[in-house]
């Protein structure tokens, strides 16, 4: 077993856990390289007749060969044995009952509903039944199809044990994982990533990985996109700097294990179903690699938020961390948006999020703290879904407290909170088990029922004959 050191040109960040040091490479979209053993990367070519130290050269392609160079993604892996050395795949038994990869109307386990939905945090079983990341993963909603290479799925997970003797591979799309409770130590073919709550990790389509739980039970959120990949959003008039900086995205350095592992299992998600194949070695046998298609993580506290500085509430798109675009300019298959600590300074302005009906669909989660638009009921580890054109906005308590504040024009710092949103142009279908879940808040609608009319003809407002003008 070997622990990598970064190449001399790499920028590194180090984290310690149990005496181990994790070294990372900096930069989203960069062409990176890493060697766990010096001299194992071929020089000047990708697939020599005989690779250094007798390794096998294997390319992992994230885009078609003919994709434009600016969007072409691939990585060369130099490994002890190639991935193809395994027994045939078979459907996993027992099958996973709560994963979906196709959301058309014929999928009997999903329904369409415009109702506002909210879920309380799911309990994580402390020991029994044992659930690793794969078994603890379940789909909440989604749209499109992994077979048609267009769409997304939103999952949640609750796990109480590390993956042992197996690795997971998602052939359907990219995973963006948001841990809310408990660190994740993720071993990938490119190396290891330690991801605590407050950070995110992206595992691109096709990578094999295993999830360990160094702090014990963990839960969180997962978005999955079909047929495209996440990228930084355009900044437009913001300029060259701001929001998420490419240099703050960190990828692993090469790490490998050379051990005999009879019965090691590869669990492959394909079309939303799970298949298994066995082999006699660990898939984490990559001694060196180079390319621009790699797993990466990001610390959300490094996000540089923008906001209005005089009046009105900015649209939430100003808080986009990553986007998965469609072929229509400005229309996202899926945006990952956060609501981090920040200053609120707008004058004569209702500062919480405004009441809204949106052509996009919004799935929200809360990592910690209290969300500014919900005084109670929306808890860390919980979730909400407001689908296309479904009304939503601040609850009654938030509205009444905001408009009656005597210091409403004073600057205030929103702190101790971190919420996020997965937003998509595609209308989701919701899994029946999510609708039937005991965690579902069936009284969610009540948080708005108390909103009352403040309109009066006697308070200097407009009359029906004279429209309100300023």
Swiss-Prot record:
Catalytic activities: homogentisate + O2 = 4-maleylacetoacetate + H(+)
Keyword Iron appears in the UniProt entry: yes
Cofactor(s) listed in the protein's UniProt record: Fe cation
Top-level taxon of the source organism: Eukaryota
Cystine crosslinks: none
Pfam families in the cross-refs: HgmA_C, HgmA_N
Signal peptide (from-to): none
Assigned keywords, A-Z: Dioxygenase, Iron, Metal-binding, Oxidoreductase, Phenylalanine catabolism, Tyrosine catabolism
Sequence positions that bind Fe cation: 356, 362, 392
InterPro entries, A to Z: HgmA_C, HgmA_N, Homogentis_dOase, RmlC-like_jellyroll, RmlC_Cupin_sf
EC number: 1.13.11.5
Pathway recorded for this protein: Amino-acid degradation; L-phenylalanine degradation; acetoacetate and fumarate from L-phenylalanine: step 4/6
UniProt cross-references to SUPFAM superfamilies, sorted A to Z: RmlC-like cupins
Biological processes annotated in GO: homogentisate catabolic process; L-phenylalanine catabolic process; tyrosine catabolic process
An example Gene Ontology molecular-function term: homogentisate 1,2-dioxygenase activity
Family that this chain belongs to: Belongs to the homogentisate dioxygenase family.
Protein name (database record): Homogentisate 1,2-dioxygenase
Organism: Oryza sativa subsp. japonica
Lineage start: Eukaryota, Viridiplantae, Streptophyta, Embryophyta, Tracheophyta
Gene (name only): HGO
């Amino acid at each position: 077993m070997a622990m990598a050191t970064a190449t001399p040109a790499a920028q590194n960040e180090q984290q310690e856990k149990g005496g181990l040091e994790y070294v990372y490479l900096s930069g989203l979209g960069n062409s990176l390289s890493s060697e766990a053993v010096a001299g194992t990367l071929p020089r000047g070519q990708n697939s020599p007749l005989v690779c250094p130290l007798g390794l096998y050269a294997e390319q992992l392609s994230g885009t078609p060969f003919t994709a434009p160079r600016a969007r072409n993604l691939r990585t060369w892996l130099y490994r002890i044995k190639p991935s193809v050395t395994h027994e045939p795949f078979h459907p996993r038994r027992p099958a996973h009952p709560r994963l979906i990869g196709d959301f058309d109307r014929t999928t009997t386990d999903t329904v369409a509903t415009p109702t506002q939905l909210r879920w309380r945090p799911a309990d994580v079983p402390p020991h029994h039944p044992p659930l690793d990341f794969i078994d603890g993963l379940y789909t909440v909603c989604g749209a499109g199809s992994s077979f048609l290479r267009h769409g997304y799925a939103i999952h949640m997970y609750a796990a109480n044990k590390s993956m042992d003797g197996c690795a997971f591979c998602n052939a359907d799309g990219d995973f963006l994982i948001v841990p809310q409770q408990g660190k994740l130590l993720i071993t990938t073919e490119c190396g290891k990533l330690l991801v605590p709550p407050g950070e995110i990790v992206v595992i691109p389509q096709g990578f094999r990985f295993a999830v360990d739980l160094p702090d014990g039970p963990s839960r969180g959120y997962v978005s999955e996109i079909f047929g495209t990949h996440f990228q930084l959003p355009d900044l437009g008039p913001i300029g060259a700097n701001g929001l998420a900086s490419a240099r703050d995205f960190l990828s692993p350095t090469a790490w490998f294990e050379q051990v005999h592992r009879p019965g090691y299992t590869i669990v492959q998600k394909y079309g939303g179903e799970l298949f298994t194949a066995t082999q006699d070695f660990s898939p984490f046998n990559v001694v060196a690699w180079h390319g621009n298609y790699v797993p990466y993580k990001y610390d959300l506290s490094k996000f540089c938020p923008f906001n209005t500085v005089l009046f009105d509430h900015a649209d939430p798109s100003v808080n986009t961390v990553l986007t998965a675009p469609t072929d229509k300019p400005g229309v996202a298959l899926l945006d990952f948006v956060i609501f981090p600590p920040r200053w609120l300074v707008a004058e004569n302005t209702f500062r919480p999020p405004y009441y809204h009906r949106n052509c996009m669909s919004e799935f929200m989660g809360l990592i910690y703290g209290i969300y500014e638009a919900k005084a109670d009921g929306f808890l860390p580890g919980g979730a909400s879904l407001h689908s296309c054109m479904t009304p939503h906005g601040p609850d009654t308590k938030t509205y009444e407290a905001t408009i009656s504040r005597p210091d409403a024009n004073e600057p205030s710092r929103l702190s101790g909170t971190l919420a996020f949103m997965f937003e998509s142009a595609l209308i989701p279908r919701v899994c029946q088990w999510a609708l039937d879940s005991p965690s579902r808040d069936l009284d969610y609608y009540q948080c708005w029922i108390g909103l009352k009319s403040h309109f009066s003809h006697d308070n200097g407002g407009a009359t029906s004959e004279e429209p309100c003008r300023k």
